Every structure is written in C-alpha cells, then in structure tokens.
A protein has these predicted regions:
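Charge-rich (acidic/polar
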Residues: 1-136
Length: 136
C-alpha cells in the first residue's frame, strides 16, 4: 500500500527521471555489485548512502502518513474546515516534494560514486539501453 511504501522509504517511481537518464540508484547498484565490478570502497560507500537514504525517506514518509491521518480524522470527526484542508494538503505537498528530491539526490550522489563504464554497464544491465545506444 501507499502507506507501507511511505513508511518503508520505497521509491514509488519518485526517481524515475534520474533512473532512466543514467543516474543509478544505490539499491540496484548493490544488487549488481558483481557485474558492475564495484570496488570494496564503492560498495561500502553505496551501502552507507542507501542506509542514510532509507533513514531520511522513512522519516519524511512517516510525517506524510501522520498528516494524512490528521486529514482523515478531521473528516471522520466532521471537524474539517476549508482552512484546515488547505493547511494539511499544503504540508503534505511540501513533504512529498522533499521526499522526491531526496530520492533524486540519492541517485545523483550514487552516480558520483561510480565510473563512467560502470554507469554504462548499469544502464545495459537494467535494460535501459536501446539498439541505437541511447538510453530510455
């Protein structure tokens, strides 16, 4: 469910723009450690990046879930107002933007840990390379 995804720091497609344009994410990089020939230093840095990313996205996700529960409760209790709807939905939107930025920034940070040939291999292994050699 969306709630579980938010609480678990799941990607939910938030980094698709990065992923499809040559910016690998740490979870898939770790899954491809051997074929990408990651060095020990790269693997350790990627594990650290993923751990920090999950911590941050779970924290933001929990905040989103809490606000959504407040919104639900306001409707359930018949205590909702136009002003409160505006406040809560604005807070949720800000957090969702922060969450997406966190996912995208993690892909940027991951890419900086890799060599150009590793990024190219990642694209191919993930099936993003077309016969013309371009990605998507």
């Amino acid at each position: 469910t969306e709630t579980n995804n938010l609480l678990n720091g799941a990607g939910m497609g938030y980094a698709k723009a990065a992923e499809l344009n040559g910016y690998p994410g740490p979870m898939h990089v770790l899954e491809l450690t051997r074929p990408l020939k990651l060095t020990d230093a790269q693997r350790i840095a990627t594990e650290k990046l993923l751990t920090e990313h999950k911590r941050e996205t779970r924290e933001i996700g929990a905040q989103v879930v809490a606000l959504e529960r407040q919104l639900d409760a306001a409707f359930a209790n018949k205590s909702v107002s136009e002003r409160r709807i505006g406040e809560l939905t604005t807070e949720v939107a800000v957090l969702l933007a922060k969450l997406r930025a966190a996912h995208l920034q993690t892909h940027l940070q991951q890419t900086a840990l890799l060599q150009v040939d590793q990024v190219a291999a990642y694209q191919k292994l993930r099936g993003y390379e077309t016969s013309s050699g371009s990605t998507h």
